[in-house]
Structures are given as structure tokens and as C-alpha cells.
């Protein structure tokens, strides 16, 4: 693999790096060499992950070489100093401090400190395990695949014990796992120590989730604990954000952050992750569950006959401990009940330290926290043990929530910690809503028992929210553990300045890379109005406007025939997506879009999501299909990290700005917090700027789903007139702003025309991704003309040119219906037609006969039939006309097996069906149109025609006609209309 010298470090890279990749790798190495922190943005498709891995791993190898060289030259000197130190150990305090100083310097120079001779580990964190898996696969494909890497996962992904794996929720699995280990009842755990040196483990240098599970299952050893054994010798640790940012998760995984390189990929979410990991919520119903759980355990302990004591169910607590804990919980419940809250005012907000006042009234405080935390852990494990062996009906869900809440509250101690809490936190108390919980059901976390154990919510029940509003609070915890460097990177970090000010850590290295594509590969348009000239604005006050919803639907419908392959449509929220779907289904717009491209909607469930994505990709790769539409939500699964390269995503429509809910208590408090702490010196953004920036970041992330590599191309359509606002434009990624500098048309027609021209040019000049076809095309046979030749229309030259553009686009979009998309082998086993040959009459005379036609637009008949092997045919009756001759005999369709004829012969057999002619008489034309489309479409047709007479806007008129006559069998009617 080629080697390139970057900042003095030899970096192996699979190809000649682009300048943006060189710049990116130089900044990464600069951070590592100087032990500094960096914020690096490089758009999706610029090879960010590859550049990040190659540069950081190259620096690690270089550092190892330095350490080994230093070790060889200093090891003898080090031993001599140690020998002298031992001799002088008891001889007074004169020269000893100097000797210690020299020894420390040698240790540092030789790299002896840190367990691996001072070579830092890389901790690579991202949002999801799927993103981590992609990064690990990228590492396998580099020349650094020999370096050791392991991923940390949860028991949800790694546990192979049949009894534990079947449980729902990671918390349940965790405590049941601990109980089995304590009782020595897990054979998989017992085999970890014996198997960790096996060749199957040591021979695999990069172990992702699938590798860990596969190899460990073969060895009958626990993948979860095997991953922990691999940490010590790993060069790179891959893990989700929460494993790194959550203090409890760091402790559980024994993560040592000193002298580590922390890489936070997809860091556009890191500020929220920092805030979330430092926040907690506890409800009155959770406290009531705790009381019920403790009471049930006390009854069990008081009645030893019900559950006999055994070694597996050892208790590390007494009934007196439980009685004391119950007293605390009852006091806590009473304290929470007595907190005054005005529901009409949106709850009560107090300073962050108010949370300590609440718990101190129940005698839960800093001094005894560790004792209470240990007691809670012991009880939860005991519940897991007796639940498994004796069908105990409780699961300890409330106790688990309480334990996690206390760990966040008491993550630090002392006056300085309390001062930080008062500055960075707010305690918000609100009324707890009644939940509907039926018998024999479980909550999503799996902790509610199978019986009805959730106490009914009282009228004075509360929700205690302990919210962190400063992401720097979590980031400083990483710096406080002596991390060598923290690198935040993503495709959508801009604008960098407010992000850096919020994170509140020193940032020495910054980069905002341009995209590697040029102007011919992207078309960015702001669509401020629909084809009916209705303003497109998804503001909260306009979302219930039926005219807006209808216009948005017709806008999407108008773009569908123009855009090849996949079209992604992002909505600001699920409620708006659902509202539009219902409205469009009622008005028929949904059905019209579906006829052009099948529609897929982003589901919320994990299993449903995977199935939907599989079906979508299959439809895109169907050689006989016309692509598909995927309707999703900003900040949803589709917008975060999924790859829609090439035909999977040729265009992205943003239907609105996804602002956070304005009246949400947390949003209100966040804006208020920023206003309070903002000064001229700290350059923190205002509350309103943060609110606007939240929407822009979600938009930038959704846009990043398309244009995934240097040869990719696509369109970005911002369908909300608020994008014309200069302030909103400035918050888009810089590479998008660059392409927004071109003239933006206020009307719909020119946008449609330019979009059509963009895709025509792209298909001619740019590399095209190939779909996997089961059958090869016949050859370079021209497609069937789907629209009459514009030269035959009695219209102006300008109109002819515009119609030619529309026609050519239709032909390309509908190319799957061309003769070239079919094979003679498709008809090889078809039955011969028993119709007799037609006499040699002219074409018009044949229209009076009964004919059998193959419907090439029927996608359901694509491919050989699984039942009868017949070509799908549709019988069409022709009525008698006085101008036509008498009925003639039926034409004979000859179908010949492929192997008996040559290619040249086959081209002679297939006849292209003559194009249909629209009536020249206007009255007759209107009759044909009215009989060919549904009444609602005909009414829409008259409105569009009237509008054209009034304003003479050809683009708007054609946009409307595209919506109405969007089926190939109706294209010939465009001739009569114009």
C-alpha cells in the first residue's frame, strides 16, 4: 500500500489522498503530536473515517517504534538506577529525592508507565454499534489490519447464556448475569480465563460484535467478558458514546482514560450525549415501586419457608438494613408529595442543588451515599437470583432507577462540585401523568413484573427532573482523567465556534473541510412554493393548513418522475409525517406518488425498521423498477448514519425546519440557561441562536445521507421558504452554502426545469452505478417513445423546447418500461396465441379489432410467472366507429423460444407499438381526457389550464400536468392539451 509522509509521520493510504484528506490527516497527527484537542469537520463522502484511522494508527506505530528504541538504549541504565535506589533505600533522605526524580524521567522516556510502555490507546466512540461496525470494517481494509482492536458491547449484544439472553432489557440481563456469576452458575463465564489465550482469540486482531459472538460461541466462552480480557493488549477500543461519557459505565468497564486518545466520531450529537449522561429523572411511581420491592423482600426474609435459603441466594444485607432503607424511601415519598407544583405554570423549576435538599430530608446524603448504593446493588442482585429460582414476581425496576439516579447526583463531592451543580443544572418538578398499565404486560425496559405491580399514580405524584445544560460538564470529566487528546469529528459540526464554546474544553486544532465534489454533482434548490403557488412553510402555526399540506404533497409528486432511483423525504417530526400521510391518502396524492415510485415510511420499531430498509434497497436494485420514496424524520434512524449512496438516494427533500418543541420545559430552560451564562468574553451563543442551530444541525445531518463518495451525485431540495433567510442559510454546512450561491428561482416551474436538466447532464457525464440484473438487456435498442414528438405540436418554438425537455426526462425515468429492459427468454415458455393473422389493412382499420397487448407498465408481471409461465396480457375492447372499416381478423402474435433464433432475427419479430394519437378536435380531446382520469384529477386539470391562461407560466402548468398525466399510457394526451 502506498506510503505518504504527513507531518513527519509515514502514513499508509490505499490510494493517492485528495487534498482534503491530506489536510484532515495532518490535523489529526498535529493533535496527537502536541497532546492537544481538535474539532474537525469533513463532509460525508470525503473519506473521513479512512483518513482518521490511517493517520491515528500510523502515529501509534511511530510512537511504538520510538518507545522500543528508547527502551533498548535506556533499559540497562534503568536497572542500574533501580539497583542504586535499593542500596540507598534506608540511608536517610539526602540523595533519595534526586534519585526518584531521575528514575521518573527514565520511566517516562522509556515509556514504562501506562502498562504498555507508555504507548497510548485509541478509544474510538460513535453513536451506534452499526456505525462502529462500519469503522471496524474500514480498519480491516487498511494496511493496519494487523493492529489489535476490540469492541465493547452490552449483554444485549454479547450474552450467549440461553436463560439470560431470553430476558428483555439490558438491566434485567445485567443483574441476572451477576447473580449467576456470583452463584458460579454460568459455564460460559468460567471458560473465559482458559480460552483467552487460544489461537482463535489471539489470532483475530480485529474483533467486532459478530466476530466475538462467533468465536466465543465456538469456544463456549462468554463474549461479553472475553471482550474485557482483550482490552489490555488492544491498540484501539471501539465503544458507544455512553460507555465513555457515563461515569457508571466507565467504572463497570474498568476504562482507564489516562494517556488515551479519545476520538468522538459523529460528534454532532456529542453535546446532547454529554448532557443526557449527566441528567436523571425519577418519578413518584418509581419511589412507590422501590417501597413495594423492599416490602416484598422483607416478607420473603420473614417467611423462610416460602423461599428457602441456599448458597445461590446469599444475602449481603439484613432485615434491619431493609427496614432502614424503607424508612428512607417513605420519607422521600412524603417529601416529594409535599413539593408545591402549579401544573398550569408548566411545573416548578429550582436551582440544581435543590435535588440534594429533597434527598437529604430522607437522610440520603453525600456521607452515606456509598453505603446506600452498595445496599441497593445487593438487593437488586438478590432479587435477580430468587426471581430465577423461585418465580419471584418482582424485578427491582424502581430500585434500579433509584441506584442510577443516585450515581448521577453524587458523581462528585465537595463545595466545588456543588457550585458546578448550581451553575450547570436545574431541578424541574412536574406532575406525573397517569400511565395505563394492564395486567400481564411489561414495560419496554423489562423491569415491570408480569403481574399488575405498578401502583396507581396519586393525584399529588411528581416527576423530579435533574437536568444538565452544560455539555462541558461531561467533557471536563474526560480531561480530568488525563486523556492525551480529544478529537471531535463529523460531517456536520458547523458552525464550529458555538460548539467549541459550549464544550468548554481547550481546542487548539480546528478544520472545516470543503467537499470533494464539484458543481456538476450537486443541485441545491430552495423551493419556497408548490406548483399551485401555495407558500411552503412548515412552521407550527401553518402545519394544520390543508392548503400547505396539499401543496407539499403535490411538490413531492412533481419531483418524483424527474428524480431517478431513490428519493429521501425528511419531515421535522413524526406527528407531521403522520398528518401528511393521512391527508394525502384521503385526497389521492399518496396513490399518485405510489404509482410513480413505491413509498416506504420510517417505522419506530427496530425489527420493522430493518425489514423496511431491506425492502427499500431491494426495490431500488430492482432493474425493472423506477426507484422508491423513503419518508423519514429528521433526527430519526434514517437521518443518522445510514448510507444512501448512488441510486439509493439521488435526491433529498427537506420538508421543513426541525426545531425542538418550543413549549417543552427542557427547551425553555436550556434557552434560559444560555441567556444567563452568556457573556461577551465566553462567546456562548444565545438561547435563540441555539434553538435555530438545533434545527440546522438536524437538517445538515439529513442532507448528508446523499452524495456519499467522489463519483456520487444528487439533488438537495429545501422545501420551506424560511431557508431563504440569510441567518438560516449561514447555519448550513459550508459546502452546501457554496452551492446555494447560484440564483434561486421564486417560482416552481424553473426549479423543475433546472432539476430535470441537472439529472440529464449527470446521467450523460458522470459515472453511473450499475444495478445487479438477473438478465442482460437485449442491446442498444432505442426505448419506446412515451411522449409524442414535440415537432408535431402546433405551439411556439420555446414551448416545443420545454416540452422536449419534459419528454426526454419522461423517457429516462420510464426507461424500465422500454423494450431493452426485457428478454426473449421471458417469453420462451409462453403459449402461442391462437389468434389468426391480420390482413394487410392500414393501421387505423386495425383499431376496430379486438387486440391483446402486453402491459409493460405492470411491474407485478415482471419476470417469469411462478405459476403458469405465461406472459401477462390484458384484453381491450374497441368500439365501432363510422369512420372505420368493418372488423378485421385478429392479429397473430408470434412468440419464439430464444435459443432458436439469432439476435438480429429477434429484433425483427418484436414490433414497437405505434404511438396513440390524441383527437385534434378540442371537444373530443376533453371527452377522452375526462374518461381517462378520475374526476378529481379532471377538476385539477381544468384548474391548471385556467391558471395557464391567466399567468402564461409554462413551468407551473407543466408541473401540474405532470401530476395529472403521470402514467405512460396518458402521455400522448399532452399533445392535445398544449
Swiss-Prot record:
Query: What protein name applies here?
Result: Regulator of telomere elongation helicase 1 homolog
Q: Where does [4Fe-4S] cluster bind?
A: 159, 177, 186, 222
- State any GO CC term: nucleus
Where along this sequence does the record place binding of ATP? 42-49
Question: Which GO molecular-function terms appear in the entry?
Answer: 4 iron, 4 sulfur cluster binding; ATP binding; ATP hydrolysis activity; DNA binding; DNA helicase activity; DNA polymerase binding; metal ion binding
Annotated family = Belongs to the helicase family. RAD3/XPD subfamily.
Q: Where in the cell is it found?
A: Nucleus
Checking HAMAP family in the record gives:
RTEL1
Amino acid at each position: 500500500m502506498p506510503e505518504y509522509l504527513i507531518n513527519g509521520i509515514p502514513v499508509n493510504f490505499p490510494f493517492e489522498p485528495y487534498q482534503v484528506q491530506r489536510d484532515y490527516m495532518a490535523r489529526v497527527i498535529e493533535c496527537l503530536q502536541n497532546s492537544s484537542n481538535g474539532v474537525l469537520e469533513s463532509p460525508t463522502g470525503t473519506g473521513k473515517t479512512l483518513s482518521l484511522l490511517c493517520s491515528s494508527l500510523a502515529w501509534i506505530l511511530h510512537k511504538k517504534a520510538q518507545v522500543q528504541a528508547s527502551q533498548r538504549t535506556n533499559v540497562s541504565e534503568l536497572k542500574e538506577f533501580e539497583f542504586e535506589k535499593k542500596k540507598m533505600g534506608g540511608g536517610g533522605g539526602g540523595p533519595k529525592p534526586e534519585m526518584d526524580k531521575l528514575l521518573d524521567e527514565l520511566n517516562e522516556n522509556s515509556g514504562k508507565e501506562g502498562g504498555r510502555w507508555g504507548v497510548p490507546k485509541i478509544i474510538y466512540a460513535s453513536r451506534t454499534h452499526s456505525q462502529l461496525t462500519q469503522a471496524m470494517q474500514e480498519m480491516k481494509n487498511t494496511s493496519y489490519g494487523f493492529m489489535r482492536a476490540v469492541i465493547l458491547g452490552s449483554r444485549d449484544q454479547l450474552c450467549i447464556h440461553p436463560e439470560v439472553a431470553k430476558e428483555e432489557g439490558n438491566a434485567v440481563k445485567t443483574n441476572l448475569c451477576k447473580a449467576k456469576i456470583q452463584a458460579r452458575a454460568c459455564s460460559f463465564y468460567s471458560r473465559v480465563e482458559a480460552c483467552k489465550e487460544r489461537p482463535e482469540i489471539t489470532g483475530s486482531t480485529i474483533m467486532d460484535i459478530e466476530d466475538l459472538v462467533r468465536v466465543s460461541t465456538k469456544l463456549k466462552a462468554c463474549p461479553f467478558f472475553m471482550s474485557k480480557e482483550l482490552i489490555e493488549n488492544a491498540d484501539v477500543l471501539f465503544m458507544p458514546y455512553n460507555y465513555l461519557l457515563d461515569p457508571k459505565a466507565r467504572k463497570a468497564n474498568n476504562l482507564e482514560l489516562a494517556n488515551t486518545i479519545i476520538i468522538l466520531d459523529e460528534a454532532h450529537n456529542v453535546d446532547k450525549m454529554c448532557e443526557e449522561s449527566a441528567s436523571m429523572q425519577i418519578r413518584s411511581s418509581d419511589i412507590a415501586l422501590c417501597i413495594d420491592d423492599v416490602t416484598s423482600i422483607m416478607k420473603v426474609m420473614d417467611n423462610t419457608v416460602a423461599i428457602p435459603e441456599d448458597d445461590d441466594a446469599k444475602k449481603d444485607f439484613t432485615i434491619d438494613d431493609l427496614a432502614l432503607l424503607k424508612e428512607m424511601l417513605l420519607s422521600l415519598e412524603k417529601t416529594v408529595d409535599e413539593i408545591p407544583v402549579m401544573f398550569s405554570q408548566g411545573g416548578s423549576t429550582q436551582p440544581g442543588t435543590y435535588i440534594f435538599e429533597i434527598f437529604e430530608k430522607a437522610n440520603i446524603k453525600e456521607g452515606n451515599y456509598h453505603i446506600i448504593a452498595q445496599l441497593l446493588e445487593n438487593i437488586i442482585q438478590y432479587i435477580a437470583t430468587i426471581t430465577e429460582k423461585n418465580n419471584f414476581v418482582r424485578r427491582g425496576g424502581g430500585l434500579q432507577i433509584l441506584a442510577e439516579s443516585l450515581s448521577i447526583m453524587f458523581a462528585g463531592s465537595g463545595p466545588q462540585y456543588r457550585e458546578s451543580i448550581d451553575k450547570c443544572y436545574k431541578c424541574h418538578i412536574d406532575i406525573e401523568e397517569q400511565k395505563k398499565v394492564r395486567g400481564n404486560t411489561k414495560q419496554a425496559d423489562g423491569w415491570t413484573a408480569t403481574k399488575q405491580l405498578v401502583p396507581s399514580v396519586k393525584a399529588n405524584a411528581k416527576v423530579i427532573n435533574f437536568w444538565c445544560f452544560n455539555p462541558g460538564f461531561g467533557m471536563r470529566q474526560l480531561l480530568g482523567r488525563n486523556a492525551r487528546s480529544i478529537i471531535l469529528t463529523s460531517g456536520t459540526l458547523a458552525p464550529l465556534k458555538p460548539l467549541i464554546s459550549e464544550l468548554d474544553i481547550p481546542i487548539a486544532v480546528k478544520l472545516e473541510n470543503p467537499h470533494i465534489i464539484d458543481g456538476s454533482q450537486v443541485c441545491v434548490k430552495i423551493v419556497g412554493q408548490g406548483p399551485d403557488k401555495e407558500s411552503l412553510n412548515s412552521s407550527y402555526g401553518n402545519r394544520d393548513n390543508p392548503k400547505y399540506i396539499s401543496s407539499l404533497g403535490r411538490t413531492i409528486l412533481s419531483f418524483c418522475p424527474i428524480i431517478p432511483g431513490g428519493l429521501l423525504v425528511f419531515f421535522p417530526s413524526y406527528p407531521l409525517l403522520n398528518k401528511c400521510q393521512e391527508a394525502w391518502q384521503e385526497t389521492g396524492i399518496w396513490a399518485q406518488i405510489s404509482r410513480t415510485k413505491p413509498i416506504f415510511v420510517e417505522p419506530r420499531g427496530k425489527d420493522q425498521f430493518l425489514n423496511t430498509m431491506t425492502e427499500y434497497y431491494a426495490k431500488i436494485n430492482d432493474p425493472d423498477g423506477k426507484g422508491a420514496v423513503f419518508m423519514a424524520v429528521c433526527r430519526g434512524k434514517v437521518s443518522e448514519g445510514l448510507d444512501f449512496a448512488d441510486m439509493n438516494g439521488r435526491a433529498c427533500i427537506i420538508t421543513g425546519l426541525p426545531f425542538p418543541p418550543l413549549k417543552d420545559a427542557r427547551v425553555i430552560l436550556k434557552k434560559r440557561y444560555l441567556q444567563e451564562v452568556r457573556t461577551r468574553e465566553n462567546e456562548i451563543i444565545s438561547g435563540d441562536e441555539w434553538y435555530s442551530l438545533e434545527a440546522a444541525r438536524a437538517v445538515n445531518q439529513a442532507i448528508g445521507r446523499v452524495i456519499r463518495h467522489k463519483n456520487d451525485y444528487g439533488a438537495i431540495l429545501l422545501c420551506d421558504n424560511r431557508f431563504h433567510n440569510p441567518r438560516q442559510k449561514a447555519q448550513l454546512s459550508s459546502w452546501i452554502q457554496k452551492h446555494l450561491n447560484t440564483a434561486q428561482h421564486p417560482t416552481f416551474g424553473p426549479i423543475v426545469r433546472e432539476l430535470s436538466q441537472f439529472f440529464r447532464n449527470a446521467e450523460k457525464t458522470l459515472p453511473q452505478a450499475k444495478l445487479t440484473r438477473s438478465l442482460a438487456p437485449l442491446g442498444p435498442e432505442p426505448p419506446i417513445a412515451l411522449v409524442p414528438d414535440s415537432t408535431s405540436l402546433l405551439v411556439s418554438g420555446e414551448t416545443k423546447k420545454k416540452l422536449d425537455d419534459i419528454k426526454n426526462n419522461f423517457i429516462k425515468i420510464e426507461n424500465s418500461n422500454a423494450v431493452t429492459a426485457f428478454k426473449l427468454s421471458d417469453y420462451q415458455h409462453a403459449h402461442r396465441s391462437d389468434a389468426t393473422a391480420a390482413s394487410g389493412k392500414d393501421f387505423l382499420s386495425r383499431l376496430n379489432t379486438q387486440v391483446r397487448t402486453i402491459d409493460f407498465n405492470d411491474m407485478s408481471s415482471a419476470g417469469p410467472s411462478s405459476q403458469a409461465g405465461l406472459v401477462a396480457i390484458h384484453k381491450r375492447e374497441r368500439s365501432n366507429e363510422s369512420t372505420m372499416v368493418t372488423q378485421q381478423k385478429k392479429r397473430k402474435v408470434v412468440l419464439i423460444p430464444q435459443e432458436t433464433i439469432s439476435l438480429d432475427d429477434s429484433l425483427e419479430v418484436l414490433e414497437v407499438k405505434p404511438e396513440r394519437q390524441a383527437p385534434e378536435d378540442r371537444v373530443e380531446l376533453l371527452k377522452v381526457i375526462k374518461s381517462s382520469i378520475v374526476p378529481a384529477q379532471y377538476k385539477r386539470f381544468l384548474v391548471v389550464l385556467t391558471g395557464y391562461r391567466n399567468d402564461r407560466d409554462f413551468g407551473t402548468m407543466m408541473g401540474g400536468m405532470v401530476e395529472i398525466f403521470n402514467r405512460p399510457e396518458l402521455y400522448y394526451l399532452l399533445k392535445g392539451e398544449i
